[in-house]
Curated annotation (Swiss-Prot):
InterPro entries: ClpP/crotonase-like_dom_sf, Enoyl-CoA_hyd/isom_CS, Enoyl-CoA_hydra/iso. This is Probable enoyl-CoA hydratase. GO terms for biological process: fatty acid beta-oxidation. Involved in the degradation of long-chain fatty acids. Keywords: Fatty acid metabolism, Lipid degradation, Lipid metabolism, Lyase. Pathway: Lipid metabolism; fatty acid beta-oxidation. It comes from the Bacteria. PANTHER family: ENOYL-COA HYDRATASE-RELATED. NCBIfam families: PRK07658.1. It catalyses: a (3S)-3-hydroxyacyl-CoA = a (2E)-enoyl-CoA + H2O; a 4-saturated-(3S)-3-hydroxyacyl-CoA = a (3E)-enoyl-CoA + H2O. It is an enzyme of class 4 (lyase).
Length: 258
């Protein structure tokens, strides 16, 4: 049985982690997640993605038992680099990815969620990076992404103390963008938002994601030039013609990604 299942309905893909009891992010999980992303990226029938954990947790972190098999600095650094590459791929993915968080998103689980474009969390979920409690540090880019969402001082407090925060606190801090009362509502809200994304032109969604994260590689001026270029490309697309025509005809547009 695969550790990650992939189901697609109405242009929305749901990736579900099946690794009880805590949905730990083992090497196998990371490999299967990468494989699922390969499928989603090339499938025109997928326009938005939800990542969710089966059972009690989104993901309670890395596979600690697997750590005992690492042999020295080289093995551990390689594990971190592989994890970082996957998280970067998720953040750079051309289709929006939503993390649907319930139970706990700790350690590598939170690093996975932070790499997603949007985080929706149950108010009683626990989110944190407790690696320092084990005498190690976050290795899947947690030290880089958390400060972007909550600021450097708050990131130091959260990582340095090793204490988790609730989904409600994470929403107040801006780490989570949408709150929910429980797991059922998390999934409901995630599917509703993913469906809205799926109604849009795939090309414009890809351009939007590229532009929102362009400051990682471009200056402000460079990002503006890229925006102007992508605007011109979008304006000439068949989807733009359809969108404008649908507006004039007072109907819902049917975008085809052309």
């Amino acid at each position: 049985m695969n550790a990650i299942s992939l189901a697609v309905d109405q242009f929305v893909a749901v990736l579900t982690i099946h690794n009880p009891p805590a949905n730990a992010l083992s090497s196998r999980i990371l490999e299967e997640l990468s494989s699922c992303l390969d499928q989603c990226e090339t499938d025109a029938g997928v326009r938005s993605i939800i990542i969710h954990g089966e059972g009690r947790f989104f993901s309670a972190g890395a596979d600690i038992k697997e750590f005992t098999s690492l042999k020295g600095n080289e093995d551990s650094s390689l594990l971190a680099e592989r994890g970082q590459q996957l998280m970067e791929r998720i953040e750079s993915f051309p289709k929006p990815i939503i993390a649907a968080i319930h139970g706990a998103a700790l350690g590598g689980g939170l690093e996975l969620a932070m790499a997603c474009h949007i985080r929706i969390a149950a108010e009683d979920a626990k989110l944190g990076l407790p690696e320092l409690n084990l005498g190690i540090i976050p290795g899947f880019a947690g030290t880089q992404r958390l400060p972007r969402y909550v600021g450097t001082a708050k990131a130091l407090e959260l990582i340095g103390s090793g204490e988790p925060i609730s989904g409600k606190e994470a929403l107040d801090l801006g780490l989570v963008s949408i709150g929910a009362k429980d797991e059922a509502e998390v999934i409901e809200k995630a599917k509703a938002l993913a469906a809205k994304f799926a109604e849009k032109s795939p090309q414009t969604l890809a351009s939007l994601l590229e532009l929102l994260y362009s400051n990682k590689v471009y200056s402000y001026e460079g990002s503006l030039k890229l925006e102007a270029k992508r605007f011109g490309e979008a304006f000439e697309s068949e989807d733009a013609k359809e969108g404008i025509q649908a507006f004039l005809e007072k109907r819902k547009p049917q975008f085809k990604g052309e």
